[in-house]
Amino acid sequence: MRAKDLAIEAELKQSFLANMSHEIRTPLNAIVGFSNLLVSEDDLPDEEKADFINTINTNCELLLKLINDILELSRIESGNMTFSYSTCNLNNWVDSMYMTHSLLIPKEIEFIKEVPDAAFFINTDVNRLSQIMTNFLNNATKFTKSGYIKLGYEIDFSTYEVSIYVEDTGKGIPKEEQRMIFERFYKQDEFVQGTGLGLSISMVIAEKLGGKISVASEIGKGSRFTFLLPYHNESEEVFSAG
């Protein structure tokens, strides 16, 4: 059995390295190709030059994101991922996330925040929470062309859980793919740029924080990604503010 496990592990590592090499080559090829065109073609129109430069910049950002994600995976696998816990006012946190992403979401998409009237406090790693939800928001933005994107949270006082969610009216995810999207390097759409690592990393972070991620989606109607996080029952008394 041990030999079989080692063989499976070796196969997974080989597959990971092959995928990683492919994902790194793709933006590098674009950077090198368009850079060579800018150098070799003296009579390119200014508009075309600007397009090439923009493409190079986009692929540089993608490559940097890929490298950061790979480093994050390395920290996860070596057990060196660090967490710093503090008290988080969820209403203030949603406000901050809303302000940041309202600049990034296209104006034709309505960006909505949904929070309870009374602020609710939890003990968590705020940066890691933001990392998870930023991933959800980025994916919603990629796959939503009209309608809305919602960011918010709900409290279930009967189960002592907080549901922090991103909901969209995007293209939706086929049922058979809803588990696969959390696998490394999996992309729902090969024509949409991304590292294919974000949801895999988010899943691990969610588990390290003591929570879990779920997805509900319907083709043509949209998706809802939820981070479900337990809280201590004394939060109702100590951490709620009217």
Regions found by a protein language model. Give the residues of each.
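Helix-loop junction within the histidine kinase core
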Residues: 74-85
